[in-house]
Swiss-Prot record:
It comes from Neurospora crassa (strain ATCC 24698 / 74-OR23-1A / CBS 708.71 / DSM 1257 / FGSC 987). This is Putative uncharacterized mitochondrial protein NCU16001. One of its GO terms (cellular component) is mitochondrial membrane. Its main location: mitochondrion. Keywords: Membrane, Mitochondrion, Transmembrane, Transmembrane helix. It is found in: Mitochondrion membrane. The chain crosses the membrane at residues 28-48, 67-87, 123-143, 154-174. Could be the product of a pseudogene. Product of a duplication of 2 fragments of the ndh-2 gene in the mitochondrial DNA. These 2 fragments, which are not contiguous in the ndh-2 gene, are connected to each other by a palindromic sequence of 37 bp and together they constitute an open reading frame.
Length: 234
């Protein structure tokens, strides 16, 4: 459902001539998340015993479904803060009776043309963040629990490089057939054999402010794992 919503938003923004504002995208994302919550609640009774694919690589249980529902609810609460303009309040404050009775209140009115701050623009990036969280949480490996702190920071950082990093780690967990404790052993073995002379130039491209927000060790491990996995595929 999240992937279909992402594709539909990208298509509507690329094909149509009209350029919608970010508030409309936020409202569409809220409706899509409500459908996701309904879909997950209806599937709780069906997958009561859990569903596992590829030896536990994709493992879905009621616990993971409840966790996804909780993330969707929090995301709806975050998006609804910036999805609706105080239009009624604005016009009430501009009414002549209101101006004559409370003239000082006009200074506190919010104009409709006030731009939103950059971290609150658009709901498309929030869908990518939710997709990262669902990919990481659905994996039964132990290493899929450690990057969860990135998901909470992505709402504040809101930068493309960290979203791509989360998608890369999620794709790595799905592309490699490693589960449970085997994943920790393989990632640690990759770290010991990785040539950091190749990773350091890529590592320097990240902004210094953004690097301080992340754990440097995890960033190096993620890059090393992705590069090593690409070498294994070739």
């Amino acid at each position: 459902m999240i992937i279909m919503t992402i594709l539909s938003l990208l298509l509507t923004n690329a094909v149509t001539l009209r350029r919608d504002i970010s508030i409309l995208f936020n409202r569409i994302v809220i409706i899509a998340l409500i459908y996701c919550i309904l879909h997950d609640t209806m599937s709780l009774s069906i997958i009561s015993k859990g569903v596992g694919l590829h030896g536990g690589l994709l493992h879905i249980t009621n616990i993971t479904q409840v966790f996804q529902i909780f993330i969707f609810l929090i995301s709806i609460l975050i998006l609804q803060l910036t999805s609706f303009d105080p239009i009624k309040k604005f016009y009430i404050m501009r009414h002549p009776r209101f101006i004559n009775k409370w003239p000082r209140a006009i200074g506190y009115s919010i104009p409709l043309s006030t731009p939103l701050p950059p971290p609150l623009r658009g709901g498309g990036v929030d869908l990518f963040i939710l997709l990262d969280a669902c990919l990481l949480w659905a994996n039964s490996g132990t290493i899929s629990r450690s990057p969860d702190f990135i998901i909470t920071k992505l709402y504040c950082i809101f930068h493309c490089s960290f979203i791509l990093l989360g998608l890369g780690v999620g794709g790595l967990l799905y592309g490699s057939s490693t589960t449970s404790l085997d994943g920790l052993y393989i990632i640690n073995s990759i770290q010991s054999h990785v040539n950091y002379s190749i990773i350091n130039p890529l590592y320097r491209h990240f902004n210094k402010i953004q690097i301080k927000m992340l754990n440097n060790k995890f960033l190096r491990l993620s890059m090393g794992a992705i590069l090593a996995h690409a070498n294994y595929d070739t």
